[in-house]
Swiss-Prot record:
InterPro entries, A to Z: Kinase-like_dom_sf, Prot_kinase_dom, STRAD_A/B-like
Entry protein name: STE20-related kinase adapter protein alpha
GO cellular component: cytoplasm; nucleus; serine/threonine protein kinase complex
Subcellular location: Nucleus; Cytoplasm
Chief localization: nucleus
A GO MF label: protein kinase activity
Domain notes: The protein kinase domain is predicted to be catalytically inactive.
GO biological process, one term: activation of protein kinase activity
Pfam families on file: Pkinase
Keywords on record: Cell cycle, Cytoplasm, Nucleus, Phosphoprotein
The gene coding this protein: STRADA
Organism of provenance: Macaca fascicularis
Amino acid sequence: MSFLTNDASSESIASFSKQEVMSSFLPEGGCYELLTVIGKGFEDLMTVNLARYKPTGEYVTVRRINLGACSNEMVTFLQGELHVSKLFNHPNIVPYRATFIADNELWVVTSFMAYGSAKDLICTHFMDGMNELAIAYILQGVLKALDYIHHMGYVHRSVKASHILISLDGKVYLSGLRSNLSMISHGQRQRVVHDFPKYSVKVLPWLSPEVLQQNLQGYDAKSDIYSVGITACELANGHVPFKDMPATQMLLEKLNGTVPCLLDTSTIPAEELTMSPSRSVANSGLSDSLTTSTPRPSNGDSPSHPYHRTFSPYFHHFVEQCLQPNPDARPSASTLLNHSFFKQIKRRASEALPELLRPVTPITNFESSQSQDHSGIFGLVTNLEELEVDDWEF
């Protein structure tokens, strides 16, 4: 593997970052007080810090990437991310507040998301899945972002719960811009693309069959719609389909037409729903892929099956449409936004989501912490330890 020199990598990235036009924060390292490390990533070359923006006292996240250790391929990858971050401007896409070079590190500054990611929520509070209305609000925000991305001529290629971030005011943001791929070549929009996502091991369960096949037929924006369907199952069931399955078996399952489903009274046999929860298993719609259910209290005396619930026919149909094996049979993001599944939405996400996410408490209210006294930060760090920040791609 060839590596750029420190000067070469910094100069290459700087051509993108020093002309930051989207920045609402100053692109200077001295303006940010790094408080604590909350994650690592990008082949261990990236450190994620909680930081305080000194001019306003606002808490932000700062991704610092060691450019001196990056290969040529990694630098090109990062350049693509920065280009997309400047190109995109949408209320449901995570905005980059500043990007700049400091001491041979690429710094990427974004607002701190007080509710974390949707994956954090299902891992820490909604282990058996979220309620349907909350999912509707979240997926509506994701589809609005995807509709914009697709109209801009890009494929996202990394839609999953950990790339859906929720702010303090209940707004939904799609992140993971690093994996976006342009379908424009020489000024013309291509019908399909063939590039396989780099550094994609963690996203394999969400990828569509046509992306995994890596054949001459290629794939297009409809591959993101498949990922939306998988993400819907992830949010509703509390786990992602195909989890822990070997890549080759996963590919075979998808190519053979195995379609995951929502786990409820319409998809789980009645005899399983009446079993003792410790003995019952719920088939997620995948052959040989069983998920052991866990006891939950019911009326204070006997445990009930965690999936003894019924999602609406509209939600089931929505997921079925997204997971059509034939990409041409999947609706576009704009078409899905008009699906009956979203008719249950009556308010803005910013008004409804904080209520629907109770008893989750957003990580916030540390304004009283002074620059020399970070006692309030210790509580924040404790809460952050529960979040899977490594998976956040801001």
